Amino acid sequence: DDAVADGVHAISGVVDS
């Protein structure tokens, strides 16, 4: 996940990559 979206998509970020 992106560093910026990491805060918002902490969970989705893992799948979103």
From Swiss-Prot:
- Superkingdom: Eukaryota
Q: Which UniProt keywords apply?
A: Secreted
Its cellular-component GO annotations read:
extracellular region
What tissues harbor this protein? Expressed in skin glands.
Disulfide pairings: none
| Keyword Cytoplasm among record annotations | no
Per the annotation, which location comes first and is thus the protein's main one? secreted
Q: Where in the cell is it found?
A: Secreted
Family listed: Belongs to the Frog skin active peptide (FSAP) family. Septenin subfamily.
Purpose:
May act as an antimicrobial peptide.
Q: What is this protein called?
A: Septenin 1h
Q: What is the lineage of its organism?
A: Eukaryota, Metazoa, Chordata, Craniata, Vertebrata
